[in-house]
Amino acid sequence: MEEVLTPILLGKVCPYCGKDSELIDSSEIYGTSYGPIYICRDCDAYVGCYNGTTNSLGRLANKELREAKKRAHHYLDQLWKPNRNKRYRTYSWLSEKLGIPREITHIGMSDVEQCNRIAGLAIEKLKERGVDFEIWPSDDSLLIKKKGE
């Protein structure tokens, strides 16, 4: 697994400019401390850390990628959250669909293109299941079912 966890995927290097990231307290970004984050100030890119550690949740993300990650989570989480024990199976399915090792099948390690692919795969799976699901606000043009309709 070590060989696939590059400095970019570990949040140590900015994927936009190639500079080393800086470890700071998240209060500099959010006004409240949620723990440490890695940041590239030049690119306004940052990523949080696992609770109580300085291990990043993935790659640094600029505004576009942060939005893409939120959107991917919005759809993927609807596949497993109704039944929490499905999380591992959902991520194993996603790993197979993306053709990447399970160990790096994390939205936090994804780029914009991969986040969009994850959202698309999750939407397809939700439609396949025939369940109502909530759409992301900017996806209003999608012809998909909205929860409660």
What are these regions (language model features)?
Residues 1-4, 27-30, 59, 81, ...:
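A general structural-boundary detector
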